[in-house]
Amino acid sequence: MNIQALLSEKVSQAMIAAGAPADCEPQVRQSAKVQFGDYQANGMMAVAKKLGMAPRQLAEQVLTHLDLSGIASKVEIAGPGFINIFLEPAFLAEQVQQALTSDRLGVSQPTRQTIVVDYSAPNVAKEMHVGHLRSTIIGDAAVRTLEFLGHHVIRANHVGDWGTQFGMLIAWLEKQQQENAGDMALADLEGFYRDAKKHYDEDETFAERARNYVVKLQSGDTYFREMWRKLVDITMTQNQITYDRLNVTLTRDDVMGESLYNPMLPGIVADLKAKGLAVESEGATVVFLDEFKNKEGDPMGVIIQKKDGGYLYTTTDIACAKYRYETLHADRVLYYIDSRQHQHLMQAWTIVRKAGYVPDSVPLEHHMFGMMLGKDGKPFKTRTGGTVKLADLLDEALERARRLVAEKNPDMPADELEKLANAVGIGAVKYADLSKNRTTDYIFDWDNMLAFEGNTAPYMQYAYTRVLSVFRKADIDEQALASAPVIISEDREAQLAARLLQFEETLTVVAREGTPHVMCAYLYDVAGLFSGFYEHCPILSAENDAVRNSRLKLAQLTAKTLKLGLDTLGIETVERM
């Protein structure tokens, strides 16, 4: 259940009855402090101004029409006109009981949409590096959340699998008589790529051959297509190993590389010309956009076809958006691409809208993110200043977690230790990123992310096992517990119950904004509230069976919420630590 939505509807009806316009916003929010109740309606200020009355006067009139019987134990006006709402313990108890009867913990399903999520997007013939981490794991958390809510989600891995680099690579492989790319590891291909680029820059004969090979590849020549396909296959096979290690849901079936849109590009350029949006300028085909200005203050020109006939990333992105609407039938498209690409995407989408390829009713959303930085505040690099390979980062995470787990569990069997180290190490890397607001840069710090205190994966995983340990210690009759009533009589019980029942509200925010850090903060809060509840409200030594069973049910909902919440983030839970 979404209590915030329920209260918003009730307060809105009362505001309208008090004379507010039909489109008034009640602005019901979760209260920041317990003394302000569980929820606060802050919409009186804006509406009172429109009505020409004092906000407190409007709030008083709203209260005369507000019926929250059976939901709130107390409703009061605070300050200039805020309405504080304190939830009824019996209502909380009833909702906890309801949540425990469903695998979804009472979370309702919104209207089902088809949502395309563009994320990860590594380049072919290059190993994934830390720069791919944020897009991959933030995008995957969004996918998991949207799917849990019941949407039809299409994962789109926009792989860089087209362009002049393939002419270079094939030409260099051929020169080295190593055409059988299937026998090569990706690390070899990276070395070949560097050598090919060096020769391309320094040897005009080689560069000319590479350009010719690109033309042959683009024209569909069988030999060159086969070589290209091998390069793609090797890359994606290697990347799949990384995806599996990261516990993300991407597979080979989700690859929708740049090459997919290639056949659409000539038609798009012709159509934009026919619509008068694109014009010839100095031999190139350009769209001038009034929405963007150059240094002189004139409309900015966006090239969609070069003088030599080649296409640009913008052209591909126009085709991509068109395809996602017309072919995939998207109701919404989310792009997890770093913030440096924002203007480029905005320009492509402006052209898309002007051309009528995607209607305004279908949102195209750039869920941008900042950079991963080292402790020195500079982009995260190796000690020698090189790019950190993602596989190396995960290896180090596993090794550090292995030492940490072995230190705390010296007698743990090797296979169990390895499984636990993997959950802790990979979870730590992912959670450290996901727990930060994606729009900002963040400092990558091994010590912080592997700590058992604070908002970290190890702490959250431990918090989950701590709740489970209560059930291991208790001799529980599952059927008796299922039929036992929930009784909320202590403040800490009420606070924990109210927060647990805000799970759906949290999921809704993550789904709408693409901000997994909101889920991390929520789960950390739940873990903290359970800790206080556990300390002050004895469970196994409760004064009677009714209280004991009720508190066990609160613990049960806590465990289920932590597990399900961490699952939406792609963080593995463990039974023991």
UniProtKB/Swiss-Prot annotation:
Chief subcellular location:
cytoplasm
| Compartments where found | Cytoplasm
Q: Which GO terms describe its molecular function?
A: arginine-tRNA ligase activity; ATP binding
What span is annotated as the signal peptide, if there is one?
none
Per UniProt, the keywords (alphabetical) are:
Aminoacyl-tRNA synthetase, ATP-binding, Cytoplasm, Ligase, Nucleotide-binding, Protein biosynthesis
Please name the InterPro entries in this protein's record: aa-tRNA-synth_I_CS, Arg-tRNA-ligase, Arg-tRNA-synth_N, Arg-tRNA-synth_N_sf, ArgRS_core, DALR_anticod-bd, Rossmann-like_a/b/a_fold, tRNAsynth_Ia_anticodon-bd
Q: Which Cys residues form disulphide pairs? A: none
**GO terms classed as biological process:** arginyl-tRNA aminoacylation
Catalyses which reaction(s): tRNA(Arg) + L-arginine + ATP = L-arginyl-tRNA(Arg) + AMP + diphosphate
Question: Domain of life, per the record?
Answer: Bacteria
A Pfam family annotated for this UniProt entry:
tRNA-synt_1d
Does the entry feature the keyword rRNA-binding, yes or no?
no
Which CDD domains has this protein been placed in?
A: Anticodon_Ia_Arg, ArgRS_core
**Its Enzyme Commission number?**
6.1.1.19
GO CC term, one of those recorded: cytoplasm
Assembly and oligomerization: Monomer.
What's this protein's family per the entry? Belongs to the class-I aminoacyl-tRNA synthetase family.
> What is the official name of this protein in its record?
Arginine--tRNA ligase
- Source organism of this protein record: Salmonella typhi
Gene from which the chain derives: argS
